[in-house]
Amino acid sequence: MELNDLISKTGQWLKGTGDHGDIVMSSRIRLARNLSKKPFPNKARKKDLQDILAIVQAAVKDILFFKKTILLKMTELDNVDKQFLIERHLMSHEHANNPEGKALVVSEEEVLSLMINEEDHLRLQVMESGLNLNETWKIASAIDDALSGKLDFAYSISWGYLTACPRIPARRCEDPS
């Protein structure tokens, strides 16, 4: 799969086929994770970011959820491609900036996207069409479990998963409002 394959079709979450698709466009769950014993992206050096990218890249290649995905390195994308990915809600504006050591993994149907080295080492996003939070959560949780089987995440018994941004809860869903 290539980026042009995404451009030529509509993402699953945009089709309006889910529950209450006439009212609710999509359901989205996002999880932030960081690797233990690695500096968070805002404190990482270029070499650290490249090492983290290589570690995550090696982990996802063996996980079933990532079999029909494409890995896009931000240094290899032009501004038009980055804007397309932002408009499809597959990555943030911040991820497009300072592209060194950053990548995006996107599934064929755009249900799954994984930003590597944005504000956190991993920003997992799952989007489904319509009002479908339960199924969206099940998918996100299963992917998170698979990733945690391959990667050692930064975790505190007191605080939960450690994130770069205190606004993002470590143990519950984020309220985007």
For each feature predicted by the language model, list its residue ranges.
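Long, Pro/Ser/Thr-rich low-complexity/intrinsically disordered regulatory tracts in eukaryotic proteins
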Residues: M1-S158, C173
